[in-house]
Design a protein with these regions (language model features):
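Conserved beta strand-loop-helix elements of the APE1-like EEP
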Residues: 3-13
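Polybasic, low-complexity RNA-engagement segments
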Residues: 11-169
């Protein structure tokens, strides 16, 4: 949840002021699941939601014009943060959404975990939550969001990034 930009200047290049030109054809907002994702944010009017391939990203609306200009002028590796991934006819929330302060926790079924189960989740170990509803669940520890799982009844598919898992304690 921050704004970062990096630019390099070659020696001998001219420097000067910079203005963002007005766009003649603004980029259209065509996100199929946009209404669903807006419920995931406490203040959806403060965010711009865009689809990039099968991923959906969000960034602060106040930077919309700047980000669209930079995307049109440069090859941007990443803009915003991932809030969802389109998988067939469904959308799966991404882990970055669970870390957002503007996350609307009421939009998801929440499951409070014990310390042992929270550590098990963060190790990407198998979890079973038979008492919880089926579907996407927001896991919390002491009311702090940890991430998402997809509960399919007899087990949960862990949506925590594998490269972030705890290997040793």
């Amino acid at each position: 949840e921050g704004f970062y930009i990096c630019a390099f200047r070659k020696k001998g290049m001219l420097t000067g002021s910079f203005r963002i030109p007005k766009q003649k054809n603004p980029v259209s907002e065509t996100v199929e699941f946009k209404d669903i994702m807006r419920t995931w944010l406490k203040h959806p009017d403060q965010w711009t939601i865009r689809q990039q391939d099968r991923f959906v990203v969000a960034y602060p609306a106040k930077y919309k014009q700047l980000i669209e200009y930079l995307n049109s002028q440069f090859i941007c590796i990443s803009t915003g943060f991932g809030i969802g991934e389109l998988r067939g006819k469904t959308v799966v929330p991404q882990h970055a959404l669970s870390m957002l302060k503007d996350l609307n926790t009421k939009a998801f079924n929440k499951v409070e975990l014990t310390l042992e189960r929270a550590l098990s989740y963060l190790r990407c170990e198998a979890l079973t939550l038979p008492e919880a509803a089926a579907g996407i669940l927001l896991l919390t520890y002491e009311n702090v969001p940890l991430g998402f799982v997809k509960n399919v009844g007899n087990h949960c598919n862990n949506l925590y990034p594998k490269e972030w898992r705890i290997r040793k304690l």
